[in-house]
Amino acid sequence: MGNSVMEKIKGGLVVSCQALEDEPLHSAFIMSKMALAAVQGGAVGIRANTAKDIRAIQSEIDVPIIGIYKKDYDDSDVFITPTLKEVREICETGVEIVAMDATTRKRPHNEDLKEILSAIRKEFPNTLFMADTGSIEDVYYADSLGFDLIGTTLYGYTEETANKNISDDDFSHLKEVLKSTKRPVIAEGKIDSPSKARQVLTLGCYAVVVGGAVTRPQEITTRFTNEIQKIQEERGK
């Protein structure tokens, strides 16, 4: 399954369809229709959160899905498919790719990422596993553990990389990631325009994931209202 899945997403756009519990669009049904709309627009894959959303999306579309499970634990900052329990639950949906936090941070219950990956590969040998990384150190770590794909998902979202953007310094972090691993790199995180998506693919990324810029209306609206607000601020000077 691995090679055919990789061919399907190569050079394409994966749309992240997620809405958390405190967001207006939080609904498996709504996410399934969001995914359908994304595929109709040309998306070659979908990234989705929770088994419930994934199964609803699977009933609507027939493209590869990157599955995750966002869950908070009191004893760790790791929240993207953080423990073996969540990894297994997402694998059981039959998604082609499962992504998980692959930072060097302490995991909930002191679970070990190497042990998680080793155990789950025995249970689901045909599933591909994607490492959501923040720093270059994370990339080396994930590479050494044998992840199938490396994502830049958490760049700008960890304590070490806080407030950084993938496009900073002419995409310097992404360029370093591409030099640091021979595994397929999936660009993800703060890719908020078509031009950015095109540029990361031109640099050599295998595929690109875009989320909020496509599927979070409140974020899209805020970008417009922030610009409009500047008119009032300029007039007030």
From Swiss-Prot:
Catalytic reaction equation(s): an N-acyl-D-glucosamine 6-phosphate = an N-acyl-D-mannosamine 6-phosphate
Single GO biological process annotation from the record: N-acetylneuraminate catabolic process
EC number: 5.1.3.9
Keyword Isomerase: yes
Gene Ontology cellular component list: cytosol
Function: Converts N-acetylmannosamine-6-phosphate (ManNAc-6-P) to N-acetylglucosamine-6-phosphate (GlcNAc-6-P).
Name of the protein in its database record: Putative N-acetylmannosamine-6-phosphate 2-epimerase
